[in-house]
Amino acid sequence: MNSMKRYIFGNWKTYKTTQEVKEFFSVLNQTKLTKNPDVVFGVAPVFVHLGLANQLERNECLVLAQDANYVMNKANTGTVSYEQLKDIGVNYVIIGHSERRKLFHESDELINQKVKTLLENKMRPILCIGETLEEYEANKTKAVLKDQLEKDLKGIDSSLLKDLIIAYEPVWAIGTGKTASSQTAQDAIAYIRTVLGLLSSKTIANELPILYGGSVTPDNVSELLAQKDINGALVGGASLDPHKFIQLIEAK
């Protein structure tokens, strides 16, 4: 792995009750973690648990949001704005997750607005991109990634990209138990850097954190993180178990 910081982020989706959130942080807070300044970790609970997670956290665990609305002070029933998140100390936000794209029909144009607004307000979007199984089998991975990056980052000043994090999540590997091989993940993320270099600069492309997401577990995380272009992981199921999450954080 290169010399950049390592990011381990857990996406809890719509799992965990209030009691389960308390139990998770009870275990995490009582664990003496290796204090490595180059490892950044956090979890993304549902909106109603963000305040609770912030109150319970005692081990430098970031609290992330799973989405954000890019408008403020408007009549948008059922959403939470970026400013409201920032107001409670949440600065990292997952944007464009494949489940948001598919289940909520989020377009690249909408995702672009969200990413742009977060960056302009000094927040850190975690932009998720990736291909479906059909696209993967048709050898369209590169075309899909290029198209998503061009649309999702359209009109965003390059100077703002220093706060962007990208998560490559092949849709066919999310929640399926299938994991892209470390080489497949490396190749895709290396290509993402190539496209970023064309859209911004080689310096930005080389310094921007890019994570892998898709059935990451304590058993495969070290091999994935050993790849030169992979700077961390966006983890689903394995992040729900505090003991497994700790293993992910402490992985060598």
Curated annotation (Swiss-Prot):
List, alphabetically, the Gene3D superfamilies matched. Aldolase class I (3.20.20.70)
- MF terms per GO, please? triose-phosphate isomerase activity
Q: Where does substrate bind?
A: N11, W12, K13, G175, S215, G236, G237
A single GO BP term for this record reads: glyceraldehyde-3-phosphate biosynthetic process
Pfam families given in the database record:
TIM
**Keywords assigned:** Cytoplasm, Gluconeogenesis, Glycolysis, Isomerase
Query: What pathway, per the record?
Result: Carbohydrate biosynthesis; gluconeogenesis; Carbohydrate degradation; glycolysis; D-glyceraldehyde 3-phosphate from glycerone phosphate: step 1/1
State how it assembles: Homodimer.
Role according to the record: Involved in the gluconeogenesis. Catalyzes stereospecifically the conversion of dihydroxyacetone phosphate (DHAP) to D-glyceraldehyde-3-phosphate (G3P).
Q: Could you name the domain of life of the organism this protein comes from?
A: Bacteria
Subcellular location per UniProt equals: Cytoplasm
**InterPro entries assigned:** Aldolase_TIM, TIM_sf, TrioseP_Isoase_bac/euk, Triosephosphate_isomerase, Triosephosphate_isomerase_AS
Protein name in the entry: Triosephosphate isomerase
Reaction catalysis annotation: D-glyceraldehyde 3-phosphate = dihydroxyacetone phosphate
Q: Which organism is it from?
A: Mycoplasmoides gallisepticum (strain R(low / passage 15 / clone 2))
Question: Which SUPFAM superfamilies does the record associate with it?
Answer: Triosephosphate isomerase (TIM)
Respond yes or no to whether keyword Isomerase is given for this record: yes
